[in-house]
C-alpha cells in the first residue's frame, strides 16, 4: 500500500495543496481504510477511484482537514477590521457599493459570523447594506455545518454568556445563530489552488485567511497568495493569522504594519497618514522558514465581542493605541523568522 499511498498523497497535493507528512500519514491511512471499506473495494483499487470520482475525492479531503475553530479568534485582528479597515474603506466607497469581505478557509463558520457580529455591534442593521460577507472552504461537510449555524460550547471558548444570549438562541445543549446574523453570510466551496473562481468569489476588498496556511509548504503558500490576489480589488487587504503572517511574507504583496498589527495590501492601499502605519515593498527573496506554531491559549485572548456587545464599551471608548515605543517594528518582527 506504500506506493499507492504515495500516489494518493501526490494527487491530494496537486489538486488542493494539502501536504500530508508525519502524523498526517496515520490519519490518511485510517481514512483510506475506512473509505475502501465503505465502498466495498480493495485499498489497492482506491487510487483509481479517486482519480475518476470527484465526489469521492472530496469525501477523502473532508476527512483529512482539521477544522478546529471558535468564535472571535485572534480578537485584535477583528478589532483592526472594525476600528480601522472597515471605516476607511467605507469612507472611500461613499456608499456606492457594499464592502466585500471573504473568510477563506472558513471551516464551520465561526470566523465569518464573528466578523458579522462585531460589525453589527458598530453599524447595527446597516451592516446588511454596507457589507457583503462570503465564507469559502474546500470541505463541503463543514460548509454544511456553517450554513446550519448550530454550535456547541466548544465554539465559545472564552466568549461571555451575554454574547451568546444576544446573538444565539439556546436549543438543548447547542446554540443556534439568530437568523438576522445567519442570513448575512453566503458560503461556497473554495479550492485555493483552482486557476479560476466563479464571479461570486471575486472582487473582495478584505480577505481573512487565518490559521489555514500551516497545512501548506512554502511554494504552495506562495501559489495560494497569488491566487488570493486575483480575488482582491486593486486596493484590497489580506489578513493572515498572527502566527503565520511573517512566514507568509513571500514577495507576493507588500506587508503593512499598523498599530502593531500586520496585514498585506494590494496596489495602492488605503493607508492612514500616521507614523504608526508603515508599508514595506515585497520581498525579493522569501524566507524559507516554517510557520511558527501559536502557543497562546484561548483563555489568554479575551474575545473581541466582550468589548463590543450592546451595553458594554463601544469602539469610541476603547483604550488609546499602544505607545509607539512599545509597538513592534517590521525589522524586529521579521527577525523572528530568521
Model regions: which residues?
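Alpha-helical segment of the N-proximal tetratricopeptide repeat
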Residues: 328-338
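Conserved class I S-adenosyl-L-methionine
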Residues: 97-109, 114, 132-134
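Extended basic-aromatic, gly/pro-enriched interface segments that bind polyanionic ligands
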Residues: 104, 125-208, 212-216, 220, ...
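A short glycine-rich, Lys/Arg-flanked "PGG" loop and its adjoining helix->strand segment in the class I
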Residues: 222-234
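Core SAM-dependent methyltransferase catalytic element
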Residues: 253-318
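Conserved AdoMet
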Residues: 1-102
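Conserved SAM-binding loop of SAM-dependent methyltransferases across substrates and taxa
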Residues: 108-126
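Conserved beta-strand signature within the Rossmann-like core of class I S-adenosyl-L-methionine
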Residues: 234-242
Amino acid at each position: 500500500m506504500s506506493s499507492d499511498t504515495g500516489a494518493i498523497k501526490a494527487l491530494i497535493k496537486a489538486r488542493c495543496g494539502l501536504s500530508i507528512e508525519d502524523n498526517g500519514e496515520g490519519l490518511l491511512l485510517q481514512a483510506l481504510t475506512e473509505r475502501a471499506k465503505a465502498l466495498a473495494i480493495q485499498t489497492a483499487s482506491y487510487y483509481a477511484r479517486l482519480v475518476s470520482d470527484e465526489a469521492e475525492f472530496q469525501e477523502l479531503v473532508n476527512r483529512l482537514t482539521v477544522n478546529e475553530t471558535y468564535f472571535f479568534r485572534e480578537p485584535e485582528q477583528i478589532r483592526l477590521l472594525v476600528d480601522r479597515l472597515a471605516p476607511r474603506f467605507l469612507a472611500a466607497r461613499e456608499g456606492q457599493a457594499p464592502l466585500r469581505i471573504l473568510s477563506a478557509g472558513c471551516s464551520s463558520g465561526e470566523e465569518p459570523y464573528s466578523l458579522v457580529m462585531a460589525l453589527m455591534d458598530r453599524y447595527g442593521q446597516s451592516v446588511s447594506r454596507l457589507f457583503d460577507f462570503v465564507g469559502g472552504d474546500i470541505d463541503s461537510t463543514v460548509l454544511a455545518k456553517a450554513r446550519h449555524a448550530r454550535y456547541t460550547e466548544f465554539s465559545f471558548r472564552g466568549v461571555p454568556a451575554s454574547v451568546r444570549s444576544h446573538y444565539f438562541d439556546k436549543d438543548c445543549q447547542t446554540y443556534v445563530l439568530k437568523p438576522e446574523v445567519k442570513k448575512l453570510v453566503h458560503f461556497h466551496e473554495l479550492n485555493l489552488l483552482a486557476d479560476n473562481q466563479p464571479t461570486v468569489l471575486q472582487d473582495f476588498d478584505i480577505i481573512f485567511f487565518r490559521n489555514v496556511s500551516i497545512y501548506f509548504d512554502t511554494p504552495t503558500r506562495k501559489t495560494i497568495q497569488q491566487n488570493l490576489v486575483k480575488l482582491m480589488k486593486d486596493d484590497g487587504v489580506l489578513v493572515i493569522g498572527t502566527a503565520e503572517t511573517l512566514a507568509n511574507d513571500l514577495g507576493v504583496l507588500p506587508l503593512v504594519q499598523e498599530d502593531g498589527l500586520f496585514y498585506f495590501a494590494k496596489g495602492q492601499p488605503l493607508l492612514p497618514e500616521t507614523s504608526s502605519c508603515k508599508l514595506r515593498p515585497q520581498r525579493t527573496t522569501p524566507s524559507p522558514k516554517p510557520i511558527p506554531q501559536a502557543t497562546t491559549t484561548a483563555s489568554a485572548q479575551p474575545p473581541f465581542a466582550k468589548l463590543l456587545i450592546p451595553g458594554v464599551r463601544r469602539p469610541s471608548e476603547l483604550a488609546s493605541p499602544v505607545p509607539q515605543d512599545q509597538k513592534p517594528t517590521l525589522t524586529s518582527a521579521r527577525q523572528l523568522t530568521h
